[in-house]
Design a protein with these regions (language model features):
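Short, hydrophobic secondary-structure boundary micro-motifs
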Residues: 96-101, 136, 166-170, 217-222
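Non-transmembrane alpha-helical segments in soluble domains
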Residues: 85, 89, 110-113, 154, ...
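Aromatic-glycine hotspot motif
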Residues: 70, 82, 150-153, 157-158, ...
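Long hydrophobic alpha-helical segments typical of transmembrane helices together
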Residues: 197-229
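GST-like fold's C-terminal all-alpha helical module
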Residues: 116-208
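Amphipathic alpha-helical surface "interface" segments used
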Residues: 105, 179, 227-229
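GST-like domain detector, emphasizing the conserved glutathione-binding G-site
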Residues: 2-140
Length: 229
């Protein structure tokens, strides 16, 4: 979570060689990385390449075909939005950190991020179970288990943001709030019947406010290109 001692702007000439974020914005992982990079003030270019419809093209960039992938200025390819945002936090030229420095607040933020990332994961598993598995092979016990995990994640997040509402502005939003907003919007697009908005008013309000921010608007959910704000 912290910059290495030998890390300096001289080792990362971002203005000359901006980083390349690879993946589609219908992925919550790609989207949270794109929004995070904007809020950190780090220049990057986005390539909307699908791990499904353009598999071969993605494989040319990263043989593992994992989104998001980040091509660093020296050509190194990083994967996983958690690791990409951790790397981005290490740049000294960033505008600000999206993570608190106080240990207790950091613990709370990481818990929220973990809940939101789990919500993303379980939403994806539900979609895959319905859309990729043949109907006659649908495994109801597994689907019930995954749905239960999703509901527990959002129950905990709703309680957290009801108890401690956050200011949602470009200058104040943190990684925990950002990730929760991205996760909720994603789940509502794909599994709205599992997580009805009326049961989660705090999360619905948080998402609505976040989607109005320029950094979110510049990276809209879907198959478009992030126009970095």
């Amino acid at each position: 979570m912290f910059p290495p001692e030998d890390f300096s702007p001289a080792t990362s000439p971002l203005k000359e060689n901006p980083m390349q974020l690879i993946g589609m914005l219908d992925s919550p992982y790609v989207r949270r990385a794109a929004i995070s990079l904007q809020l950190l003030g780090l220049p990057f270019e986005h390539q909307s390449i699908s791990v499904f419809s353009t598999f071969d093209r993605f494989r040319e960039i990263n043989p593992l075909v994992k989104a998001p992938s980040l091509i660093c200025d020296d050509g190194t390819v990083l994967m996983d939005s958690i690791l990409i945002t951790q790397y981005a936090e290490a740049f000294p030229q960033k505008k600000r950190s999206l993570l608190p420095t106080d240990l207790g607040e950091l613990q709370r933020a990481l818990r929220i991020i973990g809940l939101a990332m789990t919500a993303c994961e379980k939403s994806v598993q539900i979609v895959y179970e319905h859309k990729l598995r043949p109907a006659e092979k649908l495994h109801e016990p597994w689907l019930e288990r995954v749905s239960g995990q999703l509901l527990e994640a959002y129950k905990a997040l709703e309680e957290e943001f009801t108890k401690r509402p956050r200011a949602v502005t470009s200058a104040t939003i943190d990684q925990a709030t950002l990730t929760t907003a991205v996760a909720w919007y994603f789940s509502r697009q794909l599994v709205a019947d599992v997580v009805p908005a009326e049961r989660y008013p705090a999360l619905a309000a948080l998402s609505a406010a976040a989607e109005k921010l320029p950094e979110f608007a510049a990276a809209p959910y879907g198959d478009g290109i992030c126009q970095a704000h």
